[in-house]
Amino acid sequence: MAQPFDLGKPNRTIRVGVILMGGRTEALDVAPVDMIHSITKGFVDELPAEWLPMNIRSQAIEAEFLWVSEAGKCSTSKLTSAMSIVTTHSFDDCPPLDVVMIGAHNFSYQPTEKELAFVRKSWESCSAFLAICGGIEVAVLAGIVGSKTATAPRFALESLRQRVPEATWVNKRWERDGKLWTSGTLLNGLDATSAFIQETWGKGEGSLVDYTMKLCAWPIRDGEYGDVSWSF
């Protein structure tokens, strides 16, 4: 049996894939993928030499980014705010993904069985699966949540507790259970992705991740919503 791919000590280029459903995907849900890009050689190598010491620069990872839909290469997938993105791969020609990110689709869209089958296939092969905001709905429909601990948009938690009672649903900005990472609504995906990156590629003084968090002003917020007074 093949050993799981070690994202923290990769021996090849990491494949980061955003899986897009056929409806409209929330742009802010999938935007956090760019946080991963900010610690790659492709990004770091373009920074001015005086900005980044060589010992930190050398920590950058090699990664390629794949945008995957059922229709595939050269087709466009819709995002919110009248945006669209040209996908790079179809379900048929996409290589196994190491990191998967899925955001919410519009409420009126129902994922196809082919879409859900590809999500399940990607779940089996990946080392990390990030369901951002309503992307948890795709994970639920694909049957990969099971009895895991997960979070979701706060307004959806009670409904999910009723629909998927075998799972443990927590009221948090983000949650991790093994390779499944889930987040609250929209911008909580930034918190989830930040936590994933810190856990996977290191943190603390002298690390590229710590430097990038400061350079790019990544949010640092209470994971249990302790910094806000409102609730659902």
Report residues per predicted region.
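Extended, subdomain-level signal for the structured scaffold at the beginning of enzyme domains
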Residues: 1-129, 137-141, 158, 163, ...
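A short beta-strand/loop micro-motif in the catalytic core of glycosyltransferases
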Residues: 129-130, 150
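Aromatic-residue-lined binding/catalytic grooves and analogous aromatic/hydrophobic interfacial grooves
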Residues: 133
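Rossmann-fold dinucleotide-binding core
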Residues: 145-154, 159-183
